[in-house]
Curated annotation (Swiss-Prot):
<feature type="repeat" description="ANK 1">
    <location>
        <begin position="217"/>
        <end position="246"/>
    </location>
</feature>
<feature type="repeat" description="ANK 3">
    <location>
        <begin position="421"/>
        <end position="451"/>
    </location>
</feature>
<dbReference type="InterPro" id="IPR002110">
    <property type="entry name" value="Ankyrin_rpt"/>
</dbReference>
<feature type="repeat" description="ANK 4">
    <location>
        <begin position="512"/>
        <end position="542"/>
    </location>
</feature>
<keyword id="KW-0677">Repeat</keyword>
<feature type="repeat" description="ANK 2">
    <location>
        <begin position="333"/>
        <end position="362"/>
    </location>
</feature>
<dbReference type="InterPro" id="IPR036770">
    <property type="entry name" value="Ankyrin_rpt-contain_sf"/>
</dbReference>
<keyword id="KW-0040">ANK repeat</keyword>
<protein>
    <recommendedName>
        <fullName>Putative ankyrin repeat protein L769</fullName>
    </recommendedName>
</protein>
Length: 628
């Protein structure tokens, strides 16, 4: 152990005392970004009798005492040989170039340290802010690096953010002169193709740079310029007298900017042009239609049935842009538009269909089955008749939308039609944590004052765990008969531990109830925990759960380890996952004491199953659960 070399990663004081996190020399490069100039070499202080030192992950360690050995420079000749033992030459070259330490690159070259295989394909693009000096260094030493000259050319042409335009031209001129001095046949076609794929590189100066070296297909450049909307390049190509077919250019996914350029040049836009532009294969029809309208290119005389059919079938939302500016009512099937508008909840389009005579009763079966309750309520308010057919009732809609109080009119209809009962709906939606007003309404429809909702405990637990207490007071004041389990949970949440103990003591079935245990552990109350341990002292399965649930709180965890015979080494994965889910500081404790084993418990493990049963997804982050 002592023969290894360790470096300080970070210090945590979350436990009230420092915990030092270290990594070994194998992980130096991967665990330090390229801006870090030096790291601190340390070793555990073996003189301390209460020293703890664990490897919680391969090559990563936690300890409570360290001795600083030395500050180790990462940009120094003295450390290169050691770094090369554990990382690729590519990573070292990258680090040295980013810090402009060309002297260290010289050292690597002197030692004949080649780039790792295939690194030539991406080293230039992986170096952040590669400056002129570093780039020229690579060019002048390319007999050693063996990067393809085409790769270097493409990088220089593209790299307009870090290197000025004048410098780019200077480097390209230098490259061409350099290459002409030795026997290398460069593939300029590859470079031209690269220039064409990016609007930042498709520039006149770049085209002219290679025009004398290779036959350029100006028609390909024209089509690409039309796609990018580069009017400067379009004008440049047209001035060369290139003949073109306007319709063929339009088929090349022409941008609105380029289209406007050609209109200004005298090209006439007819319905053929529009139908070529707007076709089932068109990319982003929504944006295209908006642009055609905003640029005054699309006019009433260009609106045809064929165009409207294409839009309806490919992007119904785009019809919304047309109804405000054009008269299309006699060219469309209102029922077809209504169905699509309902399917995607496009309210403006729905209103337009209704205002233009669409029969509000015709689609009620579809609406009841497929649409959100807000739409259903809207149609009912307009006088639509809900069919007396229970098959048009879709209970899943309520489960989806019960978190919003605008579904109450929909619920009233369901209950009045006797498609379902308020009591049954409550039982079906309770785990989805419905809006408090939805619960209040449903309870007002129930005459059974002895109603119990077993799964309501999960709502209490979820709100308690994730600080979502805004509905809690309303929940416990509702007209509900709480069962014993729920009463105990309420007492624990409200801090009435004496009442909770009395209820548990008089109800034997609740002694080893895991929901009650879970809430107790979340309360961090040692006295309540001691009570539960006393009455379950011989229940090994229960004590195992106590250990797992305690792992989010160091005080509780230490208490359980010291006062039970459960071996924490047998439950490392469960404790690691549980504490990590709640973003608990106890993760540091687990790592320091060799109880940490990552967060990779299996789906459908017993912890996963229990947490799902109380409405918590252990695999989702704590913050995401809070937003539910």
């Amino acid at each position: 152990m002592e023969s290894k070399t360790y470096y300080l990663d970070k210090i945590s004081n979350n436990l009230g005392y420092p915990v030092y996190f270290l990594f070994d020399e194998i992980h130096v490069i991967e665990n330090t970004n390229n801006n870090i100039k030096e790291i601190i070499q340390v070793e555990p202080d073996y003189s301390k009798p209460d020293l703890k030192f664990t490897e919680y992950r391969n090559g990563f360690f936690a300890t409570n005492y360290i001795i600083e050995v030395a500050k180790v420079p990462l940009l120094d000749v003295t450390t290169i040989e050691k770094l090369l033992q554990y990382c690729s030459s590519f990573k070292l070259y990258k680090r040295f170039f980013e810090n402009n330490r060309l002297d260290l690159c010289d050292y690597l070259i002197t030692k004949d340290i080649k780039l790792t295989r295939r690194s030539d394909k991406f080293i230039l693009n992986r170096i952040k802010k590669l400056d002129k000096d570093s780039l020229m260094y690579i060019i002048n030493h390319n007999d050693f690096f063996q990067i393809r000259w085409e790769v270097i050319f493409k990088f220089v042409v593209s790299n307009i953010t870090n290197i000025s335009s004048d410098t780019n031209n200077e480097i390209i001129d230098y490259l061409m002169t350099l290459i002409n001095n030795f026997d290398y046949k460069i593939d300029y076609d590859e470079i031209i193709k690269h220039i064409m794929i990016d609007p930042r590189t498709l520039k006149i100066k770049n085209i002219e740079l290679f025009a004398e070296l290779v036959d350029i297909n100006y028609m390909d450049i024209l089509k690409q310029a039309c796609f990018f909307g580069s009017t400067e390049i379009i004008n440049y190509v047209l001035n060369k007298g290139i003949e073109y077919d306007f319709y063929e250019l339009i088929k090349s996914d022409i941008s609105i900017t380029a289209l406007k350029f050609f209109i200004d040049k005298g090209h006439y836009i007819d319905d053929t042009t529009i139908n070529i532009l707007v076709n089932p294969e068109s990319k982003n029809i929504n944006r295209l239609i908006r642009s055609l309208i905003n640029q005054k290119i699309l006019t009433q005389d260009l609106i045809t049935k064929q165009l409207l059919e294409t839009i309806i079938k490919t992007d119904i939302h785009s019809i919304e842009y047309l109804i405000n500016d054009f008269d299309i009512i006699n060219m469309v099937d209102l029922d077809e538009i209504m169905i699509e508008a309902l399917r995607y909840n496009f309210t403006e389009l729905i209103d337009w269909c209704i205002n233009n005579g669409s029969d509000i009763n015709r689609h009620m079966s579809f609406i009841m089955k497929e649409c959100c309750p807000e739409i259903v309520s809207k149609f009912i308010e307009l006088g639509a008749q809900v069919p007396n057919d229970v098959s048009c009732y879709n209970p899943e809609l309520i489960e989806i939308y019960c978190m919003y109080d605008d579904c109450i009119p929909y619920l009233k209809t369901i209950i009045e039609k006797e498609f379902d009962t308020a009591e049954n709906i409550i039982h079906n939606i309770i785990e989805n944590r419905p809006h408090i007003q939805v619960l209040k309404y449903l309870l007002s429809e129930i005459t059974n004052h002895d109603l119990t909702i077993p799964k309501l405990a999960n709502m209490f637990i979820h709100d308690y765990c994730y600080c979502s207490s805004e509905n809690y007071g309303d929940l416990i004041s509702l007209n509900i008969q709480f069962n014993i389990e729920q009463q105990i949970i309420i007492q624990i949440i409200e801090g009435n531990f004496i009442n909770a103990k009395e209820l548990i003591f008089t109800n034997y079935d609740c002694y080893n109830n895991l929901k009650i245990l879970f809430v107790t552990m979340m309360s961090n109350n040692i006295d309540m925990l001691e009570f539960l341990l006393e009455i379950n002292n011989y229940d090994q399965d229960y004590l195992q759960w106590v250990l797992i649930f305690s792992s989010r709180n160091v005080t509780m965890l230490e208490y359980i380890i010291n006062n039970t015979n459960i071996d924490p080494n047998l439950f490392k994965q469960e404790m690691s996952t549980f504490s990590s889910h709640f973003k608990s500081y106890s993760v540091d404790y687990l790592k320091l004491n060799d109880y940490y084993e990552g967060t990779s418990i299996l789906i459908n493990s017993r912890l996963d199953i229990f947490m799902k049963n109380i409405g918590i997804n252990i695999f989702k982050s704590y913050d995401n659960q809070r937003r539910l």
